[in-house]
UniProtKB/Swiss-Prot annotation:
Pfam families referenced in this protein's UniProt entry, alphabetically: DUF1307 (PF06998)
Keyword Membrane included in the entry's annotation: yes
Sites of N-palmitoyl cysteine lipidation: 23
Name of the molecule in the record: Uncharacterized lipoprotein Lmo0207
Organism: Listeria monocytogenes serovar 1/2a (strain ATCC BAA-679 / EGD-e)
Length: 153
């Protein structure tokens, strides 16, 4: 009987340890916004602990801010940049053209993209060695220094 109680206690402790470890690295998100020069930018970071696992950017650009008059002109202007994002593992990019604005959605999956490919992304900036991952804390500092504001949940 004593052995059964010890076995149950050990099993309970093991289950609790597994549950604590599973809960300790819960994915969370932070969102930042910036409106500047006719472009509204919304960045959403998904992270575990201090390590960013995914970043999604949604940029809404009026055609006037791009210096073009029409949807067709915007498509011509943005195509070359958009083409640079295609075919990179861990990166998805698309542009939706409306009557008066373009909406670009860019998603970077840091669990899939290589550090070499990450350095090829136009407009991507980072501090330090990205081969070890992207720090949420450092990303937040960098964004706030550039004028981004965190959106409260």
């Amino acid at each position: 009987m004593k052995m059964l109680k010890k076995g149950t206690a050990v099993l309970f402790v093991m289950i609790m340890a597994v549950m604590l470890v599973a809960c300790g690295d819960k994915e969370e998100t932070k969102t930042y916004t910036l409106s500047q020069n006719g472009v509204d930018s919304k960045l959403t970071y998904t992270y575990k602990g201090d390590k960013v696992t995914k970043q999604t950017a949604e940029n809404t650009m009026s055609y006037a801010s791009l210096g073009v008059a029409s949807k067709e002109d915007a498509e011509k202007m943005l195509k070359a940049t958009s083409d640079k994002f295609q075919g990179i593992d861990g990166l998805k990019e698309k542009i939706e053209y409306k009557d008066d604005k373009a909406i670009e959605t860019l998603e970077v999956d840091y669990t899939k993209i290589s550090s070499e490919d990450m350095n090829k992304i136009p407009g991507m900036s980072s501090n330090g060695d990205t081969s070890k991952g992207i720090s949420m804390e450092e990303s937040a500092k960098m964004l706030e220094s550039q004028g981004y504001k965190e959106v409260s949940k």
